[in-house]
Amino acid sequence: MSYLISKFFDEDQIKKIKSSYKYCTWNDGLESYTPKPGCVGHDIKKNLQTNLTNSEILYEGMDQNAEFLAYTIARSTRDPLITRTPTGGYYRCHYDHWQIGDFSTTIFLNDSDTYAGGELCLWIDNKEERFKLDPGWGITYETGTCHMVSEVVSGERDAVVFWTKSWIRDMKDLYEARYWDMMAKRYEEQTKCVYTDLKEFSENLESQFREKSYRIKRKYLRIDD
């Protein structure tokens, strides 16, 4: 399992996002969670959520985040949710449903010193990792990762959450394509802007690594044809 920490929004974008849901109607977070028979939903999840009527600014942040796009090889994204975890709120240990995507992302919206608790906790490589990021920064991880939101002791925690489907369905292929993209990027500065000799172009390392990545990605285009 792996994860990516990256920046989605700047300070001005954060202000616009907060302004857009300032007067919204908040719904019980259980609207997006069904507890097991015999279990009490609020014992597992106690938070609020809302949808933005205008979510263009959220998609703008995703589309401009090159690290996120390269990490997920994103194909599509479900409509983002704004979640609010007030004092006493939490989301106990759970897995996100397998149907919603390949990657889950949480983007923090509040200054970390305005609330206590509320860390996003991931079970990575047989140990718990806790995250509480600056506003506009998000963490993206494989949807099959066990995780929870620790109880908010004071203040309130606002976040954007969304799920992404990747072009690459096999995680082994995804890791390999990501590796070749990284290698191509590493040699990018050593590559000329223009080539007029096909042999020279085909033998430069960036071209070779890029083709290895593209070969994997093209396989999935054929599957969808």
Residue map of PLM features:
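Catalytic core of non-heme Fe(II) oxygenases with the double-stranded beta-helix
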Residues: 68-178
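Non-heme Fe(II)/2-oxoglutarate
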Residues: 1-74, 176-225
